[in-house]
């Protein structure tokens, strides 16, 4: 895992640097190009965040204003270009991202770390729903891959899809295995979970009892005129 701290961690900043590495562009052209290439499937994109990141890259001296275009009564278009420092950052950042795994924080992982909030019986049903959705996702990826093959697109353009499929299949296998383990109480998983949930609910009930008692005391004191 890498501990390097960079000025930016937003994938959109990386995408903007790559676009300007190709040629100078204005923001609308950047957004259009990213969408035409299907990059919104891998990079969260909206105009508001695009302009914000551009301003941040300007302040970091990674990009610069090349020119401002004015065509008739249309709004001005600011064209940006990549600076030398921006190119250095881009290449170094790409090398780091490809070579060094980074700890990420997926929501599914977060939910798994907090499972005692829900009973095992309910989670079994929820995992079945997730498995169905993951199966559907794999089917959609396969269909996209089929279209790419029919169009005879270079494999380079489908690498992100291959990665996404690999991650999805890994999650699907994990989820199926987890569902099986819960059902058969493998390693005492379901038993321990049930006990942990009972303990959690006991703590919650005790806290509410104390809160109710304190509220009653405050109410009594208020009636007696005590602070």
Briefly describe each language-model feature range.
Residues 127, 134-148, 168, 175:
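Non-transmembrane amphipathic alpha-helical segments
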Residues 120, 127, 154-157, 161, ...:
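Amphipathic alpha-helical coiled-coil segments and their boundaries
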Residues 1-103:
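Basic helix-turn-helix/winged-helix DNA-binding cores
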Residues 142-163:
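Acidic interhelical loop/turn segments
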Residues 161-169, 200-207:
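Extended, low-aromatic, Leu/Ala- and acidic/polar-enriched alpha-helical coiled-coil segments
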Residues 182-197, 225:
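Long amphipathic alpha-helical coiled-coil segments
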Residues 91-139:
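Amphipathic alpha-helical dimerization/coiled-coil segments
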Residues 165-185:
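Short, contiguous alpha-helical
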């Amino acid at each position: 895992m890498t501990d390097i701290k960079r000025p930016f961690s937003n994938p959109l900043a990386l995408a903007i640097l790559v676009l300007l590495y190709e040629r100078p562009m204005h923001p609308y052209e950047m957004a259009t190009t990213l969408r035409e290439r299907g990059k919104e499937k891998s990079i969260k994109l909206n105009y508001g965040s695009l302009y914000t990141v551009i301003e941040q890259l300007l302040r970091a001296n990674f990009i610069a204003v090349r020119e401002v275009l004015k065509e008739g009564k249309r709004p001005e278009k600011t064209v940006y270009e990549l600076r030398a420092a921006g190119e250095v950052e881009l290449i170094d950042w790409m090398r780091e991202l490809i070579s060094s795994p980074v700890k990420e924080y997926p929501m599914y992982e977060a939910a798994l770390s907090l499972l005692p909030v829900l009973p095992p019986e309910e989670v079994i049903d929820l995992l079945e729903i997730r498995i169905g959705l993951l199966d559907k996702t794999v089917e959609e990826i396969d269909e996209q891959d089929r279209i790419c093959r029919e169009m005879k697109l270079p494999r380079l353009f489908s690498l992100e899809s291959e990665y996404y499929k690999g991650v999805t299949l890994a999650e699907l296998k994990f989820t199926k295995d987890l569902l099986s383990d819960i059902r058969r109480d493998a390693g005492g998983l379901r038993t321990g979970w049930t006990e942990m949930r009972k303990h959690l609910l006991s703590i919650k009930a005790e806290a509410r009892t104390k809160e109710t008692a304190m509220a009653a005391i405050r109410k009594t004191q208020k009636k007696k005129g005590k602070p």
